[in-house]
Regions:
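Conserved, single-site charged/polar hotspot
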Residues: 1-180
């Protein structure tokens, strides 16, 4: 792309890049902006079909992200489908004021399914966090191990690799530590 300029209606665009998608793009609202300011960013599948899917419900997004056979430009990339586990103990380092964390829920999703708001429930209250960057930061931790599509793992990141996530509650152990 050296020496090339992307334009929309004759004007240079503000271009955003990422190494790997989840198979579906999003609009400019992912950065907290009004999507109409970046009409060239569209929430469509990342393939030749450019199909628009409604991934704004947790059920629809989870079904999409669990599909290992999604047809996408980068579906063979190592981070196309990744997963990790975290615990209430790890999350307590960044989230205070709710007691022992017992639940995490994505309460709203943006175009393409990115996590827009996160509700954290604890034994002494709850908090809601907004913005995919903030959510990625809150849930990320350098100690997490990311299982990649290629069978290898990655570590050392203090934020989640993407805001295109779903969360499963995997239960609480005898020490009252909840795993997600």
């Amino acid at each position: 792309t050296f020496g090339q300029l992307l334009e929309y209606n004759g004007d240079p665009i503000e271009a955003f890049y990422y190494s790997t998608s989840d198979g579906h793009g999003t609009d400019g609202s992912v950065w907290g902006a009004d999507a109409s300011n970046t009409p060239y960013l569209r929430a469509v599948t990342i393939n030749n079909k450019a199909k628009k899917l409604d991934l704004t419900s947790n059920e629809a997004f989870e079904s999409f992200i669990k599909d290992e056979n999604t047809d996408a430009y980068d579906s063979d990339f190592p981070m196309f489908r990744w997963n990790t586990k975290t615990t209430s103990t790890i999350l307590d380092e960044k989230i205070g004021g709710v007691g022992r964390i017992t639940g995490l829920t994505i309460t709203s999703r943006g175009a393409g399914g990115y996590a827009k708001t996160l509700k954290v429930v604890g034994t002494e209250g709850s908090k809601t966090f907004s913005g995919q960057s903030r959510i990625r930061s809150i849930l990320g931790n350098v100690s997490l191990v990311y299982n990649r599509k290629d069978g290898f793992t990655s570590t050392g990141w203090d934020t989640l690799p993407s805001g295109f996530i779903y969360i499963e509650n995997n239960g609480t152990d005898e020490n009252q530590v909840t795993t997600f």
